[in-house]
Amino acid sequence: EYEAYDVKSGVAGGGIAGYPGPAGPPGPPGPPGTSGHPGAPGAPGYQGPPGEPGQAGPAGPPGPPGAIGPSGKDGESGRPGRPGPRGFPGPPGMKGPAGMPGFPGMKGHRGFDGRNGEKGEPGAPGLKGENGVPGEDGAPGPMGPRGAPGERGRPGLPGAAGARGNDGARGSDGQPGPPGPPGTAGFPGSPGAKGEVGPAGSPGSSGAPGQRGEPGPQGHAGAPGPPGPPGSDGSPGGKGEMGPAGIPGAPGLIGARGPPGPPGTNGVPGQRGAAGEPGKNGAKGDPGPRGERGEAGSPGIAGPKGEDGKDGSPGEPGANGLPGAAGERGVPGFRGPAGANGLPGEKGPPGDRGGPGPAGPRGVAGEPGRNGLPGGPGLRGIPGSPGGPGSNGKPGPPGSQGETGRPGPPGSPGPRGQPGVMGFPGPKGNDGAPGKNGERGGPGGPGPQGPAGKNGETGPQGPPGPTGPSGDKGDTGPPGPQGLQGLPGTSGPPGENGKPGEPGPKGEAGAPGIPGGKGDSGAPGERGPPGAGGPPGPRGGAGPPGPEGGKGAAGPPGPPGSAGTPGLQGMPGERGGPGGPGPKGDKGEPGSSGVDGAPGKDGPRGPTGPIGPPGPAGQPGDKGESGAPGVPGIAGPRGGPGERGEQGPPGPAGFPGAPGQNGEPGAKGERGAPGEKGEGGPPGAAGPAGGSGPAGPPGPQGVKGERGSPGGPGAAGFPGGRGPPGPPGSNGNPGPPGSSGAPGKDGPPGPPGSNGAPGSPGISGPKGDSGPPGERGAPGPQGPPGAPGPLGIAGLTGARGLAGPPGMPGARGSPGPQGIKGENGKPGPSGQNGERGPPGPQGLPGLAGTAGEPGRDGNPGSDGLPGRDGAPGAKGDRGENGSPGAPGAPGHPGPPGPVGPAGKSGDRGETGPAGPSGAPGPAGSRGPPGPQGPRGDKGETGERGAMGIKGHRGFPGNPGAPGSPGPAGHQGAVGSPGPAGPRGPVGPSGPPGKDGASGHPGPIGPPGPRGNRGERGSEGSPGHPGQPGPPGPPGAPGPCCGAGGVAAI
């Protein structure tokens, strides 16, 4: 029969409970979520219904270029074409004189100064409180999370066998206790050595009840118990790697282009007005607002030296502006249109490598993404430029705690798990069978000190103590680490328009930029009212002959015009030299024959006779057919700048243009001078309290400390000195966006910033198609110069935004400056040298031709074969100056019509007197590129206009309409912190924040120092007498002390 030792008493008893099994390994991480299915390709767009005429629809994108037709056959020389249409306005003229400074704005009201809170004096030390009545033991708190299993104690040294105590008096039999739960069977202990049988001693007297002996040697450990309950989930694993990106969906098909609306009908040409009286010099006009600085144009070819202009009258000295009071700060205005793309900024230095972030919670396996909805009909968009690298996304919210997975099949042994949670004590084993009384041994010597007892259990939580007095305010701690970027705040209300401020100093001229790429041709704008003709300019000299260009493609067929009135008979030209034989072209249709010229004798050319007096101007003929577009020659020399004409009354404001595309980020300018401190604004409203963070997983249970001895009440100490600043706190979760504070008052204007360094010239892009001249928008009032803020942090280069929808075409602007001198035509084939003839007689003035009937719009005819070159006609007489037309009111912008075929070259109209200048309208939206029109004939150089009188100072213009907000830019990278600003006044105390959610449990702290040994508890009250036990077995017969003796007890 084997006996096991009770560990506590050293007495043979039942088997000890096995130690709880080790914590199970952490479950394997869930599989990564599958990538979402790619979205189905968008269905092809439906064909839009035909647009109703009259509604202003946005201009459609430019259509693909048509296929190049087969090369035409060389036609025969055609007749000289009519003068082409008026060319596009030339490059912008010279910079106008600077406008007079605007009236300074009114001074704003001074903001409310925040009051600095005074530091309170340290309070007097509190009186010593009386010892409170010891509270009753509270109800045990909820069971905490399982603690980590403590380290296994080292087995103590086996104690020496204690002296056997005297047998105590037999106690009364106790009540039988309830049967305990069955204990786990331990391994059978090793058999003990059988004691020797000692000599029978004499019966001793009953001794005093013996004290309990020292603990005996620890029995052999039982067999390992059954595996303990599975350990709690381990610490959350590291953040899983991002799954593979889903397959991008196929791009949507480009929808079919809707059919073009019906073309507008051509208006009936108006009748020519009677010649007006020569205009007088107008009254001195107010100077217009200073125009925006235009972009530097490409340098043109140097033109011939112009004639010296007349000395202008000296301007009147401007009046000194009144010192204005600072205007009230208006509410923020609408977001202005995005600027043009600037040059790419310089590459910034690489940022510091970020430290490893904290491990995120264990993610849950993602569900497979749903199939994307079929894309709607795709709009036919303009092919965008490739987007830049996207900004880093904001960190997502922490994933929810994953559910405990079902037990899987036994896998391979995983990595060593973290210490498991301390298991609950196993069920109490059954009381073993009563051991047999051992033989009485001799008294043993004192045993060595036994191992330290186990730590006592922590008592229930006591009632909360009274609140202590408030301590002194601690020193401000060092600044904590940079917090996470908060969520974007809500947009504030739009501000009032600021008062016009004084103009800043003139900046340095930037380096001339490289000419940008050729833009797409804009849609042809609506035809404005006819402007009054300008005075005729002087005739320019003949430019150098340009090189012969290649043959241009045939233009689309135009409607045939009605026959024009026959021109005057031309003078016979000299015979040209023999030209090279050209390829034989197809026979052209016979053109209408002109008046036969007087055939001159092929003789040597005589001296030119005097020009006869001009005859009366004939009525303008009907529009003739346009010839094939000629090859453009080289650009002629640029003419001298014309004198500034008189300023007309301002025209009505145009419609606002569509916002332009986002410009490339410009190069970083020099750091501006620090601005002056603005007046303190009113205290902002307190932001809402941050939401509670998610509760973290329960931390492991710390090691149970020993119960310390209760200390006496301490005396009240003096208030301690100010402690050192604490370590910086950890970053809190970003709170929700705070409400917008009340707008602060405007600070005084800061000193002007230093001029920025001239930007580096950009890379030359491909030349784009020239668009129609946009109309200049009405200048908005100049805002007050704000104080320069601290140096901002450089953001990442934003991706280029998509082009906005084209806006409505703007109203027609005022006539542009004098255009660049047209290119010289290519030289004609050299004719044969004729014989020199005698000088011809002076011709008589020609007769006035009869006025032709106004032609009607004909149907477009097919392209005719080019006719032969006719004889050059004589130069016609210069027409009379027409009367100035009344400035027409700008009409409402009509819907952009479909791109029509290239129009025929019309006859060059007579130059009318200069009409009144209209107010610059807003910039028109960019239209689709129109077809290239035929090249017009070189116009005559008008006479130089007289110098206009300096106008009066103009009134400030109305504020422009706010532009639509541009697209939101990408989030820039966190830049370097700016210089610390001056410390502001202490604001009022905000309301106390709500209690935050319980934070994540911290890691297991190191075991605390061993507590002092507790004082011996008070002696317990004597227990109730037990119930008499069952009678014991009869004792062994004792030695007989005589007849009839009784056995000794």
Swiss-Prot record:
Residues 1-1049 are annotated as: Disordered. Residues 15-1040 are annotated as: Triple-helical region. Prolines at the third position of the tripeptide repeating unit (G-X-Y) are hydroxylated in some or all of the chains. One of its GO terms (biological process) is positive regulation of Rho protein signal transduction. It is found in: Secreted, Extracellular space, Extracellular matrix. Keywords: Collagen, Disulfide bond, Extracellular matrix, Glycoprotein, Hydroxylation, Repeat, Secreted. Residues 22-32, 82-94, 890-899, 1025-1037 have a biased composition (Pro residues). Residues 110-121, 667-679 have a biased composition (Basic and acidic residues). It comes from the Eukaryota. Residues 234-243, 372-393, 513-522, 539-555, 573-583, 680-694, 708-721 have a biased composition (Gly residues). InterPro entries: Collagen, Collagen_superfamily. Residues 34-46, 95-106, 155-166, 199-223, 244-257, 361-371, 482-497, 562-572, 754-779, 790-799, 913-926, 967-977 have a biased composition (Low complexity). Coiled coil: none annotated. Residues 1041-1049 are annotated as: Nonhelical region (C-terminal). Residues 1-14 are annotated as: Nonhelical region (N-terminal). The modification 5-hydroxylysine is found at K95, K107, K119, K938, K950. Pfam families: Collagen. GO terms for cellular component: collagen trimer; extracellular region. Glycans are attached at K107, K950. Trimers of identical alpha 1(III) chains. The chains are linked to each other by interchain disulfide bonds. Trimers are also cross-linked via hydroxylysines. Interacts with ADGRG1. Collagen type III occurs in most soft connective tissues along with type I collagen. Involved in regulation of cortical development. Is the major ligand of ADGRG1 in the developing brain and binding to ADGRG1 inhibits neuronal migration and activates the RhoA pathway by coupling ADGRG1 to GNA13 and possibly GNA12. Belongs to the fibrillar collagen family. This is Collagen alpha-1(III) chain. It comes from Bos taurus (Bovine).
